[in-house]
Amino acid sequence: MIVGIGIDLIELKRIEAAFARQPRFPGRVLTSYEQDQMAQLAPNRQIEYLAGRFAAKEAFAKAKGTGIGAGLSWHDIEIRTEGSGKPYIVVNDDSARVHLSITHSKEYAAAQVVIET
């Protein structure tokens, strides 16, 4: 049974500006694993990666109905990738099935999350 659906759309320019203003921004949003993955990418792909992960975490928080805040932090949600390239979410202390889709364009990143019991 579907218990939550969330979607998020972010402009790459907003993420790029946040990163330029605050070089520690990725560390606030990404887990250590995600930061290591981002560091392996070419500079032009790093903003896409960061924006995609940002959108995925926002979409998950919306699907949970909590948002990012006191009960759910950026670091509680980790985005990993299967060998096929399909992204998936790892969440601390959560037994629900989570489906994730992330997409990028030249100007935007978007993510959709569906949570099932």
UniProtKB/Swiss-Prot annotation:
Keyword Cell membrane appears in the UniProt entry: no
Keyword terms, alphabetized: Cytoplasm, Fatty acid biosynthesis, Fatty acid metabolism, Lipid biosynthesis, Lipid metabolism, Magnesium, Metal-binding, Transferase
EC annotation from Swiss-Prot or TrEMBL: 2.7.8.7
Residues that, per the record, bind Mg(2+): D8, E58
GO cellular component: cytosol
GO biological process: fatty acid biosynthetic process; lysine biosynthetic process via aminoadipic acid
Names of the cofactor(s): Mg(2+)
Pfam families reported for this sequence: ACPS
Superkingdom per UniProt: Bacteria
Cited Gene3D superfamilies: 4'-phosphopantetheinyl transferase domain (3.90.470.20)
Coiled coil: none
Compartments where found: Cytoplasm
Keyword DNA-binding: no
Name of the protein this chain belongs to: Holo-[acyl-carrier-protein] synthase
